[in-house]
């Protein structure tokens, strides 16, 4: 049977990553906190994939709103990785473009996949885990630019359901030339 699905090199591994157990715990830093005894707010610092896994037990279906600002995959240098492209050789190996004898199985004229696959594999497990935290009427807001918006929309449709999409809010960042 044929089915419609959005897939990429590394998708199966990203599902495994989302479900991989973690052996860490969150530790409160009371001395660094403001009004620790009076506030109900949490500031959590750490790898966001690990933190999302840790929050599953205490906050499953309890979060009303999530805001994320993932890397935009622009290739620029930031504190975090913002360049999720594979080399052409890495992409050919992982996509099955060649058989075990080195024969080309198909001609991939669209090399775009190698620039987007790693980014999709980075965001997918995080969105799967974020979905588990949301209440039935919870919402997620995601900041993104034009580099990955189409892929993000497809992943969100899969993870959250197409019918749950509300809107895209565009922000004008600079005047166009002309």
Q: Which residue ranges define each predicted feature?
A:
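Flexible, glycine-/basic-rich loop-and-beta segments that form/coincide
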Residues: 177-178
